From Swiss-Prot:
Keywords: Antiviral defense, Cytoplasm, Immunity, Innate immunity, Nucleus, Repeat, RNA-binding. Belongs to the 2-5A synthase family. The lineage of its organism: Eukaryota, Metazoa, Chordata, Craniata, Vertebrata. It comes from the Eukaryota. It comes from Rattus norvegicus (Rat). GO terms for cellular component: cytoplasm; cytosol; membrane; nucleolus; nucleoplasm. This is 2'-5'-oligoadenylate synthase-like protein 1. Does not have 2'-5'-OAS activity, but can bind double-stranded RNA. Displays antiviral activity via an alternative antiviral pathway independent of RNase L. GO terms for molecular function: DNA binding; double-stranded RNA binding; nucleotidyltransferase activity.
């Protein structure tokens, strides 16, 4: 195609014209394609599917949804691939869908092969594709020009009905279903479509430009490589626009293109997610998302399906190489032959860090996960004026409290979403110890190695209300005696001491 060679030689200042002239589809083409696909939709809505195997009841179509580029308004000129998600009455849960998915696909395939209206459109290549999730794919032809169109059908459980557009319970059920990542994403296709569909027209132009580049200069050049899906590039582009322009609809396409290319070069740092459709206030969802964000990067979580990292397992190194080449072309250089400036976009969004310290109000800071911890400590020092040694620690639900080291970053500890950090201000030779409570939580305390154990119990009583005579402290299986010092037990910096309510039968042990 001539267009494939033209983008790299097109002036950066004229990319708007490039999109309008070469990438924007004509109204006539879109109408011809959609009119043809409407025949498929009518077949699905009118047919009452029932087979000898699989679901025991009749299978009715609840809704047919156009997804992908035809659904979200970012279709490229002459695109001939249409995706349909079909919500079915026989699926009442994610588990039922997983159980009957293949049987339903075979049933639709069988009925479709006898449909006269589709046969009149040259129905061919009808087959089930074993992907994630499995789908039915076939080719038909437009009525006017007889152009071949590839249609993909994916059956899905309608998890989000009109009464619960984004219920936390739905996402808890999704997590508990424990499906293969992406297997149940079609259930959330309405949200996926809305995430892009209602964006400004200028952003859709940038999306078309990025997708055109990806198809012509990456996919076509490396047809056998395991490359990321277009959806991952779309989400990355949306993130670049949100973070780089503060969602301004008036921006330069060349700057947007250069920004996306630079992000692709830094793919190993990307950790991107949204909480537009679900909340981290629910403990099950919070624990799951935090675990997701600790995975190998790049991480781009589907905004509608947090179980699916759409960037996982692909050859991003190839995409990065192609992005580097793109940045050297005319489309990324201005009229003075200088590189087009890119937007300031962090490789992971800033997060809210709540700094907690006993006896002080919480301190709220916005921090980037890739910033060195020493920068965070400097922000705390400027806010609170501490002169002692700052000891920071954190504890995730169900985990152990960990010391945060100055030379590391929050990203090093896998922290990419809002978190709480404990601050302890110590003065040498004081050390920090973690005291783990019976409920699994823990607190940090400052102690002098030569202080008695009783001094720590008094701190615990002041903070937590449990009287010192009712406390039992253990370290390495030994109950600590009130009138011995910490050094005699070999207690060193940042170790964990177990707190429990004193019970009969286990006597304190003196140091050996």
């Amino acid at each position: 195609m001539a267009v494939a060679q033209e983008l790299y030689s097109f002036p950066a200042s004229k990319l708007d014209s490039f999109v309008a002239q070469w990438l924007q589809p004509t109204r006539e083409w879109k109408e011809e394609v959609l009119e043809t696909v409407q025949t498929v939709e009518q077949f699905l809505r009118q047919e009452n599917f029932r087979g000898e195997r699989g679901p025991a009841q009749d299978v009715r179509v609840l809704k047919v949804l156009k997804v992908g580029c035809f659904g979200n308004g970012t279709v490229l000129r002459s695109t001939t691939d249409v995706e349909l998600v079909v919500f079915l009455s026989c699926f009442h849960s994610f588990q039922e869908e997983a159980k009957h998915h293949q049987a339903v696909l075979r049933l639709i395939q069988k009925r479709m092969s006898y449909c006269r209206d589709l046969l009149d459109l040259g129905l061919s290549n009808l087959s089930v594709i074993e992907e994630v999730p499995s789908s039915l794919i076939f080719t038909i032809q437009t009525r006017e020009t007889w152009e071949p169109i590839t249609v993909t059908i994916v059956p899905a459980f309608r998890a989000l009905g009109p009464s619960c557009p984004n219920s936390a319970e739905v996402y808890v059920n999704l997590i508990k279903a424990n499906g293969y990542p992406g297997n149940f994403s079609p259930s959330f296709s309405e949200l996926q479509r809305s995430f892009v569909k209602h964006r400004p027209t200028k952003l859709k132009s940038l999306l078309r430009l990025v997708k055109h580049w990806y198809q012509q200069y990456v996919r076509d050049k490396c047809p056998r490589a395991n490359l990321p899906p277009l959806y991952a590039l779309e989400l990355l582009t949306v993130y670049a626009w949100e973070a780089g322009t503060q969602e301004d609809s008036n921006f330069r396409l060349d700057e947007g293109l250069a920004t996306v290319m630079e992000l692709l070069q830094d793919h190993e740092l990307l950790c991107i997610y949204w909480t537009k459709y679900y909340t981290l206030q629910h403990p099950v969802i919070e624990r799951f998302v935090r675990r997701q964000l600790k995975g190998e990067r790049p991480i781009i979580l589907d905004p509608a399906d947090p179980t699916h990292n759409v960037a996982q397992g692909y050859r991003w190194d190839i995409v990065a190489q192609r992005a580097s080449q793109c940045l050297k072309q005319d489309c990324c250089y201005d009229d003075r032959d200088a590189p087009v400036p890119s937007w300031t976009v962090k490789r992971a969004p800033d997060i809210q860090v709540t700094v907690q310290q006993w006896g002080h109000p919480d301190l709220i800071l916005w921090v980037n996960p890739y910033e060195p911890i020493k920068k965070l400590k400097e922000k705390i020092r400027l806010s609170r004026g501490y002169s002692g040694l700052q000891r920071l620690s954190f504890q995730e639900p169900g985990g152990q409290r960990q010391l945060i080291r100055s030379q590391c970053s929050l990203a090093y500890y896998g922290i990419f979403c809002d978190t709480q950090i404990c601050l302890l201000d110590t003065i040498s030779p004081e050390i920090q110890v973690f005291v783990k409570n019976p409920d699994g939580g823990s607190h940090a305390y400052a102690i002098h190695p030569l202080d008695f154990v009783l001094s720590l119990k008094q701190q615990i009583e002041d903070r937590q209300g449990l009287q010192s005579q009712e406390q039992q402290l253990e370290f390495q299986g030994r109950v600590l005696e009130d009138w011995f010092d910490f050094k005699s037990y070999g207690i060193q910096d940042s170790i964990t001491i177990i707190l429990s309510r004193k019970r009969e039968g286990k006597a304190p042990s003196a140091p050996s």
